[in-house]
Amino acid sequence: MTVSQPDVTVVIGAYEAMPYLVDCLASVEAQTIGPDRVEVIAVDDGSTDGTGEYLEEFAERAAFPVTVVRQDNSGGPSGPRNLGLSKAAGRYVFFLDADDRLGHEALERMVAMADRHGTDVVLGRVEGVNRTAPRTMWDATLGRTDVFTSNIKFTLSAQKLFRREFLERHSLRFDESLWTGEDALFTMEAYLRADGVSVLADYTCYYLVGREDGKHVTKSGSYTRRFDSARALMHLIADMVPAGERRDSLMVRPFLITLAPQFGAAFTKDDEETRRHKFELAKPLMERYWHEGVARRLKVGERLRLHLVAEERADLLLDVAAFARSKKQAEAVLERKGSQVYLAYPHFRDRAAGIPDEVYRAEPSEARAFHGYREHTVGSFAPRAFRKVRRTFSRITARITSRSA
């Protein structure tokens, strides 16, 4: 065992993780970074399936330092992660779920990226195995970016490389009062406080594995916990980012990813009491954070659902949710020579419903998908304006010249 500081501490919180834990730990053993540059802190969170025993067996034969902590079940991933972080000695910390696995070069590449660019957080490309994974942020490798000028706000899971000194300086820890979405809160705050974020898009660093037994911890929990998560993230964003365009761009995330699904196709299956309760939980969030600056950043279907939530129109929302459940496509209505596209979801231009046309109007990013759409941009307007100014200037010049003569 080396006495020098390891480059990276891999923190693994494990609960009923067998047999997935076997491949998880094997992926750490296979890292090209070398055993002298890594350590593992593994916390068995009250497992009964042999997880703790396998961790201890692995610790005895591993070529790098492995610390195993066994404790009673804490009820969620926050406690084990915080405990692992408190024992970490590495310059960097990587949070690895016991169900998942690393690409062989993941740690070496991510540490090199952070060292090269001096960034506090590194995102490594993620691929899903029997489950979906975030995609929109992997278009290009970015040495240095931030949460406002990239799509990283759509990946708020904890499976990233963090500079440990940075986490300690800001006392960043996972909120143990949240049963879901605790990683979103932690990661968003890290993004906002970080001196730069790197995106490693040209190598798959992390394999997000879907469990066949359906016991993946992040998929559990009632709808009330989703509202708790949305509320906490919205409050964090509001506390850390002044009102305006930048805050609106981040608020899209909790509205789109956490809140909108509560009022989607599955809303039609909720009983009357659950529907009423969801509206009650959403009301203070809609009143405080929902406005045009957020709404215009959403696609029409999502914007319409949330508009109806804000207006407390459960009757109309049921029709929209049923339409979503049918998987039908809303008809595009092109007006003003194709420069405006409206999507005819239920109650479009229904006078009795009274929903403004603007709610149904597609923003350019969505409208471009429809044949016949003609985008009016500053670029197309400027030449016309310039020609008009030039003609006016020419007439004035001609008059002055005529009078002088």
Predicted regions and their residues:
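Nucleotide-sugar donor-binding/catalytic module of glycosyltransferases
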Residues: 1-230, 353-355, 359-363, 405
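C-terminal subregions of glycosyltransferases and related glycan-biosynthesis enzymes
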Residues: 210-405
